[in-house]
Structures are given as structure tokens and as C-alpha cells.
Amino acid sequence: IGRLVGSEMCIRDRIEIEPGEEIKIGPFDIECIPITHSTPETCALSITTSRSRILHTADWKIDADPVVGAAWSAKRFRELGDKGIDAVICDSTNALRAGYTPSEGEVAAGLRQVIQRCEGRVVVGCFSSNVARMQILASIAQLTGRYLGVMGRSAAGMARCAQQVGLLPDSFQPIHPEHLGY
């Protein structure tokens, strides 16, 4: 929406849906189901008409131990499956690979172990939308006596927004990147 507003495109009839909310739009009953992903507040949509049910997941990650947001609800997806789904539209990185992706909680433990053994400056890259990873790195920086800097316009903007809406704690205080060399 920010890009649309920034480009001065008119946004008419916008409907905001909260995670867990159900709404009706014309012939469509839509349930907004919270799912885990590196982007906070990601939701799947269960779209039902009198003739069919479609599940649209967007990108997702099954994570029973997320750092930010609610855990994946296997129960809710089992209930949807029991009701019957006519089509699933989904996208998930590495979904066709065998095995599983570690939870963000497991990633945090691994990062902490690696960074604690390092001397001096540590540089970690991640997607700018990965608010949980920013929170993990801030905690590790504090634990190891380091400072955290968030570099890049997208990452800095995401960190600011996440803090404003309460996804990052007030204690999340990155220093300006130009001060990281001191």
C-alpha cells in the first residue's frame, strides 16, 4: 500500500482484514488465517463460495517456535482439510525439498553459538522483511556486548515500522550505520 500511496495511485474500496477475522465480500466468505513466515503478520485466505473452497497461502513457513507472531496452527489447517478444499494456491521456498526448515527459535540458538565465538565485528545479512531475525540479532548483540546497526533503506524502514506497531520491543535501539566502525 505504501508504494501505491507513494505513487499517488488512488486506492478506493480498500478493505483491511485483521488476522483471524472473517468477512463477506459479495459471494465470497473469506477467513484470514495467520501463518508463519519471515514477513510478520502473513496470512492465508480461505475463500469459500456456495460451490467451492480455495485456500490461498501466499508464502509460508511451518514454524512452531516463531520469534515474532503466532505459531503455525496445524489444527486450523487440519480443520480446513476435513471440510474439503477444492484448490490450493501456495508458494513456499524449498517446499519440494525433503526435510524441514528449522524454526526461527532454532536459528536463534545457532546464530548465538556462532556469534559468541567471534571476536570483533560481525556482519549478518538477511531479508529486510525478516523482523524476527532483526530481533534475534539485537538480543545477541546485547548478550555479546556488541552494537547493532541496520543497514539499507528497506531494512531500516521495516525496523522503524515494526517498532511502531509493537513487533520489535522498545529496547531495539540500532545505532546509525556510520557509527559501526568505532
Segments and roles (model prediction):
Residues 76-82, 86-106:
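Divalent-metal (often Zn2+) His-rich catalytic cores of metallo-beta-lactamase-fold enzymes
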Residues 38, 58-60, 92-93, 127, ...:
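Active-site metal-binding loops of divalent metal-dependent hydrolases
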Residues 54-58, 85-96, 115-120:
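Gly-rich Lys/Arg/Thr-decorated short loops/hinges at beta-loop-alpha junctions or inter-strand turns
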Residues 16, 56, 89-90, 124-125, ...:
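General beta-strand structural signal in soluble alpha/beta enzymes
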Residues 3, 21, 63, 155-159:
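Short gly/pro/ser/thr-enriched loop/turn and capping motifs at secondary-structure boundaries
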Residues 1-6, 10-11:
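Single conserved hydrophobic/aromatic residue that forms the stacking wall/gate
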Residues 96-182:
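Hard-cation-handling environments
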Residues 18-77, 81, 138, 142, ...:
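Core dinuclear metal-dependent hydrolase active-site scaffold
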